Amino acid sequence: SIVLERFKENIKFNKFDKQIKTFQVGVGEKREIKELCLSHVDMGSSSIVNTNLNSDKVKIKILPLSELLKKEEISKVDVLKIDIEGFEDKALFPYFKTLNKKFYPRLILMEDSSQSDWDENILEWLFANGYRILARTRGNILITLEK
């Protein structure tokens, strides 16, 4: 996909190609196939949730985040950056349900401007489970796990 190729170029340009691995899958609550609506205005706004986009659609494979990490033999995530246009609750609730608290990511950077698309408020859950706000930007929030 164009977005993935652009992302890979940025990773290589910034010399992070040894530390960052990309996957051509989406993350969600279960293994399934979903339609991704491609935004012609802003590729980063392509969405599974917002099907009102007057755009082309492609089918993508969705995997639970815990399954993807297990497959890649990643047992602990220290920093999680997630920007999935309103699908954050679908990806994060199932992931946290599989974890012992000692394996929770230390930092999470996530978009919080799509809360109206969430079925459950993942931020409220994260705050109730030990996270606090470290910083906020336009549309994003950086939270840290209190020790």
Regions found by a protein language model. Give the residues of each.
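Phosphate/nucleotide-binding beta-alpha loop and adjacent structural elements of enzyme active sites
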Residues: S1-K147
